[in-house]
């Protein structure tokens, strides 16, 4: 025997005797919910028992569409690296549904209790009654599935490097369609456990929250998904909620028919770009520090971008090159977000919009949630006012525009001897005061009195023009008053 062959044989013998298990493929070709061979429950149990990387669970189309596996009790958590694939999607685009309605009983969101007694539904802390559970596991792929009628469709808890792609996530009325959370089990965030997950090319329909990034979820990518809600949704809250989630990227998604398209609660350094938000009460509903909103299309909402006051007076939110138009619609949808205050100031970018933590919020704060009036936050309305939050983004003032012979003059009033970036926007309607088309930018520097003035000539002719300003720390103002160019 050659020496090389001997070494290979000894290696193979060593792997066998050491208990090494090769990656396996488990085929699901029975839709009964039992532990017999061929069921989904059996396949998950088998994969969990095999410690090898990259097992596969291939779910076959059985019978005629729609293909539905109705589970009668919670499925076991996924504990091994595995690809769970509905095989029909690659062939016909059909999803294979995993449906929890056989054991999750009750009326809408009330069937989904929260972690605290008496609370229920989407807008409370919960990890109750999920469909597929990825807990303390890495390297899981979900594809070609419709995860349907659970309280949480997919729970990704303290897990990293997982991929959720080409699925439909539908009618999950508790926490979210997909919940990505670093929750330690007691409501506390964990900062390094829930990273680098990817949620791509999915359709989210009629979930309470479409997706959540909470309690330490960081460096995750959410891209090219549709988040939509219909009249069938009992609690249309947020397309995405980020709560104490940092450094995530949300790119190229569409959000429609929610209270908020996307809501950030005290998350930091998230990058939100190239999304479209329409027919929401609020397009963006924001707090947090270092978050950047770049080149989004925000139209047909009650308010385009709402920046809330918060206890951190130094928090800064950056808005750049966003296209904002046709807002001011009468959309009063307020499930832990949105805008239902009757006399609320409307527009493209509005500071100081009240949310559920604020005095003056009108709407639901979550099922069974009661906040003592003394604990509600207030937004300062007068200089030197006490016991209230400062105006967002340090109250940075919008620039002032004037026009003469189709040349704009911009005046900025700010901190002395500081750099400011001014962005200009055009509107096709002369009566519009929003930011339909990004036209360009200039940098100005204030003098010792905090004043700067500059001239700028747009290269594109638009009936009306607005501008906003961003300071060197990243805080962006509301829009200026519009000037007519014709």
Swiss-Prot record:
Catalysed reaction equations from the record: 3-dehydroshikimate = 3,4-dihydroxybenzoate + H2O
Query: Biological process GO terms, please?
Result: 3,4-dihydroxybenzoate biosynthetic process; quinate metabolic process
| Pathway stated in the Swiss-Prot or TrEMBL entry | Aromatic compound metabolism; 3,4-dihydroxybenzoate biosynthesis; 3,4-dihydroxybenzoate from 3-dehydroquinate: step 2/2
Q: Mention any Pfam family matching this sequence.
A: NosD
> Its Gene Ontology molecular function terms?
3-dehydroshikimate dehydratase activity
Matching entries from InterPro entries are given as:
NosD_dom, PbH1, Pectin_lyas_fold, Pectin_lyase_fold/virulence
Supply the EC number(s). Answer: 4.2.1.118
Keywords carried by this UniProt record: Lyase, Quinate metabolism
Q: Which residues form a coiled coil?
A: none
Q: Sum up the protein's function in the record's words.
A: Converts dehydroshikimate to protocatechuate.
Which protein, by its recorded name, is this? 3-dehydroshikimate dehydratase
Species of provenance:
Acinetobacter baylyi (strain ATCC 33305 / BD413 / ADP1)
Gene this chain is encoded by: quiC
């Amino acid at each position: 025997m050659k020496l090389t062959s001997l070494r290979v044989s000894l290696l193979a013998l060593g792997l066998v005797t050491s208990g090494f298990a090769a990656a396996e493929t488990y085929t699901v070709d029975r839709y009964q919910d039992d532990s017999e061979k061929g069921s989904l429950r059996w396949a998950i149990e088998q994969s969990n028992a095999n410690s090898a990387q990259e097992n596969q669970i291939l779910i076959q189309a059985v019978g005629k569409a729609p293909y539905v596996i109705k589970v009668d009790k919670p499925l076991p958590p996924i504990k091994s690296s595995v690809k769970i694939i509905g095989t029909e999607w690659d062939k016909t685009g059909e999803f294979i549904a995993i449906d929890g309605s056989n054991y999750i009983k009750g009326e809408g969101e009330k069937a989904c209790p929260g972690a605290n007694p008496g609370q229920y539904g989407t807008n409370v802390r919960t990890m109750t009654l999920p469909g597929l559970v990825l807990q303390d596991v890495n390297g899981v792929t979900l594809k070609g599935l419709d995860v349907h009628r659970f309280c949480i469709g997919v729970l990704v808890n303290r897990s990293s490097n997982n991929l959720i792609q080409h699925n439909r996530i539908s009618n999950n009325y508790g926490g979210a369609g997909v919940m990505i959370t670093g929750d330690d089990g007691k409501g506390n965030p964990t900062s390094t456990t829930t990273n680098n997950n990817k949620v791509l090319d999915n359709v989210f329909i009629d979930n309470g929250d479409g997706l959540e990034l909470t309690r330490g979820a960081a460096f995750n990518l959410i891209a090219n998904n549709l988040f939509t809600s219909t009249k069938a949704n009992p609690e249309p809250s947020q397309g995405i909620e980020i709560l104490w989630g940092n450094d995530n990227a949300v790119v190229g998604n569409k959000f429609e028919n929610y209270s908020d398209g996307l809501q950030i609660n005290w998350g930091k350094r998230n990058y939100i770009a190239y999304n479209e938000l329409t027919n929401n009460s609020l397009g963006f509903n924001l707090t947090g520090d270092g978050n950047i909103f770049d080149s989004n299309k925000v139209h047909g909402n009650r308010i385009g971008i709402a920046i809330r006051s918060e206890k951190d007076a130094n928090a800064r939110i950056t808005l750049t090159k966003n296209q904002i138009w046709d807002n001011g619609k009468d959309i009063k949808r307020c499930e832990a977000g949105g805008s239902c205050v009757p006399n609320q100031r409307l527009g493209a970018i509005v500071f100081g919009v009240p949310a559920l933590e604020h005095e003056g919020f009108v709407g639901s704060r979550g099922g069974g949630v009661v906040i003592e009036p003394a604990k509600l936050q207030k937004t300062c309305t007068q200089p030197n006012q006490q016991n209230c939050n400062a105006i967002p983004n340090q109250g940075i003032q919008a620039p002032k525009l004037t026009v003469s012979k189709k040349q704009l003059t911009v005046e900025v009033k700010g901190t002395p001897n500081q750099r400011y970036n001014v962005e200009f926007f055009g509107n096709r309607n002369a009566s519009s005061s929003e930011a339909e088309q990004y036209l360009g930018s200039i940098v100005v520097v204030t003098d010792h009195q905090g004043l700067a003035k500059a001239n700028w000539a747009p290269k594109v002719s638009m009936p009306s023009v607005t501008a906003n300003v961003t300071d060197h720390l990243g805080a962006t103002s509301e829009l200026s008053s519009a000037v007519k160019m014709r």
